[in-house]
Amino acid sequence: MNDMLFRTLLKRYEATIEDCMYKIQSLSENNIIIPEHVDITGEADKLLQTMAEAEDKVAVLRKYYVKNKAEAKIL
């Protein structure tokens, strides 16, 4: 995998994680209730699932596509 593709995917997954964290924080701190999403715990669960999938993808990228261990620590 070339470096640009690797970094693009990594940023994509990291952005997904940040987005989910922000949404969960907003749900819990601001008590936001969206009419279509009355099930707050269900929404939080879906967001956690999305985060877990993104973290798994980051782990796979690092495991199989990082060239050396020094580079893995930087990323």
Regions found by a protein language model. Name each.
Residues 1-75:
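Extended, charge-rich alpha-helical interface modules
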